[in-house]
């Protein structure tokens, strides 16, 4: 179980590295566009200064206009390619982030399931100890109930039950409740006018739940 969790953590680290690299690519592409724009501003300024210092004839002005148009479309084409690259990297980044988020949720769910399976196994091993405490305390005579030994055993029992309750373990209600096969295990049926039909008349062994999962069904007698 520990090896599996280490592998999941390693995969999460690798996913984070991929996302960080994609973010760096997007930032680099943005910086390239800023530098290109700054270069265009410098070029335009230089061209304007040169134009103000010289006097061109009509044919020269026409030729310069043609060059400016070619330069404009060339710069626009470069900018469009950079925008496409940024869009491509941004899309890839968003996909990787979505995949990582799904991976993280799936990993957390698997960790929770693994923890609950392990906790349920431990609780199943503790329940017979609870049963023995209850049988022992039920067998104590009236004269012995006030003895220090019995009171000490009772305190240990209550402490154990309180600890389990704090961990999410709770007892299943049975006696006097309507029979529910999801929580109760009917081991005996009887006729009893005191109870209505399909009502639990007696509980032979307590049932327990861990959070929303049944650890042990209540062993009961049901009225027909």
From Swiss-Prot:
Keywords: Chaperone, Cytoplasm, Stress response. One of its GO terms (molecular function) is unfolded protein binding. It is found in: Cytoplasm. Residues 27-77 are annotated as: Disordered. The keyword Ligase does not apply. Pfam families: GrpE. InterPro entries: GrpE, GrpE_coiled_coil, GrpE_head. GO terms for biological process: protein folding. Coiled coil: none annotated. PROSITE patterns: GRPE. One of its GO terms (cellular component) is cytoplasm. Residues 31-62 have a biased composition (Acidic residues). Belongs to the GrpE family. Participates actively in the response to hyperosmotic and heat shock by preventing the aggregation of stress-denatured proteins, in association with DnaK and GrpE. It is the nucleotide exchange factor for DnaK and may function as a thermosensor. Unfolded proteins bind initially to DnaJ; upon interaction with the DnaJ-bound protein, DnaK hydrolyzes its bound ATP, resulting in the formation of a stable complex. GrpE releases ADP from DnaK; ATP binding to DnaK triggers the release of the substrate protein, thus completing the reaction cycle. Homodimer. PANTHER family: GRPE PROTEIN, GRPE PROTEIN HOMOLOG, MITOCHONDRIAL. This is Protein GrpE. The lineage of its organism: Bacteria, Bacillati, Bacillota, Clostridia, Lachnospirales.
